[in-house]
Amino acid sequence: MIEADRLVSAGVISEEEVIDRAIRPKMLAEYVGQPVVREQMEIFIKAAMMRGDALDHLLIFGPPGLGKTTLANIVANEMGVNLRTTSGPVLEKAGDLAALLTNLEPHDVLFIDEIHRLSPVVEEVLYPAMEDYQLDIMIGEGPAARSIKLDLPPFTLIGATTRAGSLTSPLRDRFGIVQRLEFYRVEDLQHIVGRSAACLGLPLSDEGALEIARRARGTPRIANRLLRRVRDFAEVRAGGEMSGDVASRALDMLSVDSEGFDYMDRKLLLAIIDKFTGGPVGLDNLAAAIGEERETIEDVLEPYLIQQGFIQRTPRGRMATQHAYKHFGITREG
């Protein structure tokens, strides 16, 4: 799959998880960026602790790589409770969810990543658990089957999703707190990269951190990945020095340009500009032109390009914007 091969993919790569845990902020005081979310969560957490209550159920949504799992960990740490982690696709049966819920201590946090992928059967079990702290369990089979209710301790469910619109209304309505994570500003990413470098003991200059931040597509996960690749380049080609110039040379070598675009982003944009005179072009024609599946374009390639104003999605197809022409130094005809 193309996403796993891209340096600027916002998806998590398995070997990164151990390093990411080591550099992940643990408390709100260490959490950089998302000022509105940070301020609101600080108030909600303190209020819940003052009352001696569990925090209201929390839904976190936004593009991948922006720190939804990090925020869930911070909530548990701030509340001083345990965090149990799972994901929507893993919870195949109602019993899978019941096993997690019955092992929670009072005020514990249950974090469900990709919550939009819960099966309807599991979701039905979740409703009374969230609303009334009760678990309905079927005992036996056939005519002899009966339902019993188990009381659960007060707990906090944190759901994370990249597709909030895919959640059913009954599930979405049961979250008392809803937070959207936005793409990060360059200055916040610079701070994050600098902190990560310090945690890893890397001699990264302020200029080097800024260069990485500029090309990280507003995403901390990508910024930390680029930091590690710049480190590799610096160790082999620059005697370990991680200056702005070294970072720029490293990222140029890796074909990550000033906007954070890689070869696939450029291939897509240039296909629209060169092969279809800027568009509009239908998705199937565009997919054939660059040799990719339409799902790859829709889910992987174009979201960031649209968000940054390089592609416009119209009823007649995709169009390259003036911003895209300017990026490549191409004069738009007509």
Swiss-Prot record:
Its EC number is 3.6.4.-. Keywords: ATP-binding, Cytoplasm, DNA damage, DNA recombination, DNA repair, DNA-binding, Hydrolase, Nucleotide-binding. ATP binds at I23, R24, G65, K68, T69, T70, E131, D132, Y133, R174, Y184, R221. Its main location: cytoplasm. One of its GO terms (cellular component) is Holliday junction resolvase complex. Residues 185-255 are annotated as: Small ATPAse domain (RuvB-S). DNA binds at R294, R313, R318. Residues 4-184 are annotated as: Large ATPase domain (RuvB-L). Pfam families: AAA_lid_4 (PF17864), RuvB_C (PF05491), RuvB_N (PF05496). Residues 258-334 are annotated as: Head domain (RuvB-H). CDD domains: AAA. It catalyses: ATP + H2O = ADP + phosphate + H(+). GO terms for biological process: DNA recombination; DNA repair. Has 3 domains, the large (RuvB-L) and small ATPase (RuvB-S) domains and the C-terminal head (RuvB-H) domain. The head domain binds DNA, while the ATPase domains jointly bind ATP, ADP or are empty depending on the state of the subunit in the translocation cycle. During a single DNA translocation step the structure of each domain remains the same, but their relative positions change. Homohexamer. Forms an RuvA(8)-RuvB(12)-Holliday junction (HJ) complex. HJ DNA is sandwiched between 2 RuvA tetramers; dsDNA enters through RuvA and exits via RuvB. An RuvB hexamer assembles on each DNA strand where it exits the tetramer. Each RuvB hexamer is contacted by two RuvA subunits (via domain III) on 2 adjacent RuvB subunits; this complex drives branch migration. In the full resolvosome a probable DNA-RuvA(4)-RuvB(12)-RuvC(2) complex forms which resolves the HJ. This is Holliday junction branch migration complex subunit RuvB. It comes from Erwinia tasmaniensis (strain DSM 17950 / CFBP 7177 / CIP 109463 / NCPPB 4357 / Et1/99). The lineage of its organism: Bacteria, Pseudomonadati, Pseudomonadota, Gammaproteobacteria, Enterobacterales. The gene is ruvB.
